[in-house]
Amino acid sequence: KEKGMRGSIKAFIHPRIEEIQAVNGVSFSVEEGEMLAFIGPNGAGKSTTIKMLTGILYPDGGRVEVMGIDPTKKRRQLAYEIGTVFGQKEQLWTHLTPYDNFRFFGAIYDLSEEETEARIGELAERFGLAAFIDTPVRNLSLGQRIRCEIVASLIHKPKVLFLDEPTIGLDPVVKENVRELIRQMNREEHTTIFLTSHDVGDIEKLCRRIIIV
């Protein structure tokens, strides 16, 4: 819009709409159990691509498949097979404890109480959550929250885990701890990892293949 009050009024009455292609000409495949880095500058369409792969956004053209499932047609079915962590957005209810959040996620994914409790116990031990699993999320440090975010996304044993800037804002020691936990999940549960990050350490230490957009 034009500068000043006049420009603001003019833009409100006669808005100018400019069409921008967020993602165009992107084509790739990911192998089962692979740890892949999907990187590029800000505005390249990394997060938009993840949102299309997970069914949050629908592409205007082309074809998207995750494990043979079209996210635009069977998003609910796909949700049971994938997990997502957006480093700059929270999926946990901050007034609840991690434990209560995990139980809620277990119910969302139709796990029995026994299955949920067993999975919480397994992941809490693996991710070292015992000291703060009963503390409201709003009182946790950023590193503790990220660990809990990852655990929440793994409650239902997804086959694919989408990680969008999972270590953003973390100090070097906590970053390495989170990376090791991600490596462990890939190694032990054969979880496919689709990672976006501006942190070279994430890319070098986690992924064997890189796609640049």
Segments and roles (model prediction):
Residues T54:
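Helix-to-loop junction immediately C-terminal to a conserved catalytic motif
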Residues I155-K159:
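A short, proline-enriched helix->beta-strand linker immediately N-terminal to the Walker B motif
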Residues L161-D164:
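Catalytic Walker B motif of ABC-type/P-loop ATPase nucleotide-binding domains
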Residues H95, P136-L140:
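Conserved ABC ATPase signature
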Residues G4-F12, R103, A107, E114-F132:
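Conserved ABC ATPase "signature" region
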Residues E176-E189:
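Helical segment within the ABC ATPase nucleotide-binding domain
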Residues I150:
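Hydrophobic anchor residue at the start of the ABC signature
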